[in-house]
Amino acid sequence: MAKDYVTGKKTTFGNKRSHSLNPTRRAWKPNLQKVRILVDGKPKRVWVSTKALKSGKVTRV
């Protein structure tokens, strides 16, 4: 299971609820993209969330 390298976001689980409130298991997945970033001065390919990319927490190489 992929996990965000910067923020640590990963898949969370819960219940989907029908109109009659019957629970069914489901998953919420973060929007992760595989990008190359600089880690300790060297390029590395890691999973990063689009929110981290858009906010400028990491820069692509």
UniProtKB/Swiss-Prot annotation:
Biased composition (Polar residues): 9-23
Superkingdom field: Bacteria
Protein's UniProt keywords contain Ribonucleoprotein: yes
A Gene Ontology molecular function term of the record: structural constituent of ribosome
GO BP, sorted A to Z: translation
Region: Disordered, residue numbers: 1-24
Keywords associated with the record: Ribonucleoprotein, Ribosomal protein
Any single Gene Ontology cellular-component annotation: ribosome
Pfam families referenced in this protein's UniProt entry, alphabetically: Ribosomal_L28
Listed PANTHER family: 50S RIBOSOMAL PROTEIN L28, LARGE RIBOSOMAL SUBUNIT PROTEIN BL28A
Similarity remark: Belongs to the bacterial ribosomal protein bL28 family.
Protein's recorded name: Large ribosomal subunit protein bL28
Organism: Lactobacillus acidophilus (strain ATCC 700396 / NCK56 / N2 / NCFM)
Gene it is expressed from: rpmB
